[in-house]
Amino acid sequence: MTDADNLPRHRSSRPPLPDALGKLCTEGKATAQYLWQVPDDQAARAKIVTILNQIAVEAQKQNRKEMGRDVTELLTAAKASPSPQQVDLLVGGFDRLIKLWQAAKSGL
């Protein structure tokens, strides 16, 4: 028996393949990050609201209640007047959504 046989087997560190919910979360984060460059871009803000509404629908289909709560908070932030704090809140919120999605997909 070698030392390699005695080592615990670890899960793969690769992120799960994105489904519709994962793609929406990733797209939302990218759009929110874009707001650092152009904070007053109304089209990007409207896109974020649309993405958040789609995430809410997908999360409900998958019974992901914790994601629904985050989406509600992010919708409020997305509709607020543009500011660096708002962009930071949106980017951080999409990060949380991505982590919640990854945890659900990995079985945690």
Question: Language-model segments: what does each one mean?
Answer:
Residues 2-35, 58, 62-65, 81-108:
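Amphipathic, coiled-coil-like alpha-helical segments
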Residues 42-81:
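Extended, amphipathic alpha-helices with heptad-repeat/coiled-coil or helix-bundle character
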